Amino acid sequence: LCDRRQRQMCIRDRSQCVHNISGEQISVDISTLVQNLRERADWYTGLIRTQEWVTDENGNGWFNGYYDNHGRPVEGKRDNHVRMMLTGQVFSVMGNVADDAQTAAIIKSADLYLYKKEVGGYRLNTDFKEEKFDLGRMFGFAYGEKENGAVFSHMTVMYANALYQRGFVKEGYKALYTLLEQAMNTPVSLMYPGIPEYFDADGKGKYPYLTGAASWYMMTMVTQIFGFRGEWGDLVLEPKILLRQFDESGNYSAQFPFRGQTYAVVYQNPQKKEYGDYRITEVWLDGQRYAGETNTGICIPFAVLEGKENHTLRIVLG
């Protein structure tokens, strides 16, 4: 990659180009373009991992995710106050910018500075102790309302999804379940069971009609916890189910649509092993044992599944 001066020149040239689009087209070699984009992504990932990693006096670490309108980093320790925001951590974990050690550190810091079970779990940010309008409208709200320190359901669920993707299953479950518990605690949340946009400083659910969290919650349940998802057109089953989520018989079941078909799926955990200890030992497709390679997950080619509208899948864990 080019040095800093060359990068700045490239940015300047591109900024000028957008004002003078000629309409001419050129052919670009796709492999060259892919390589170029990957190199840029790797460079930015390395930069963020080192330059934007902040710590407190005890070594707890997380990413600075924002700069204010004066070009100053927002997060870290300022005037004896910790400034941490959940959003930057979510996308760092989900986008594989945070390595495994950094992800573990982020979880620890989020539990220390952002988590409050009584109000639904992970708040969007710590209390900055100032009206910082050079960062945005969030400081127009009292701490604990909306974007300023509320438990924002959408970001909490995305945090859980990111943790599941990275294999931090118990931690992802904690984020999801605390949110659910708060919503179901009607005397405090003062709402019907469901997911609100956010929980305020008193744990009250606000704006249940204004959130994308429900769809993210369901997607996380289906594709990560149940592990039922498509991959390049084929069917993947990779369960991330904790022991407490299985029923008394050690089963966990549901029905899903996939590519115009319906699947009745049951996971069986007869030895009642915890996540991390079990593997897929048997797969039964429509009553016949499937001989594909198994471990913590399995991929079934869609060619094997074509020709029927309804399927049954029984996956034995051991």
Regions found by a protein language model. Give the residues of each.
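Alpha-helix capping and helix-loop boundary segments enriched in small/acidic/polar residues
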Residues: 28-39, 76-83, 143-151, 163, ...
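A general alpha-helix detector
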Residues: 88-89, 155-159
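Non-catalytic C-terminal accessory modules of carbohydrate-active enzymes
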Residues: 112-117, 129, 140-148, 158-318
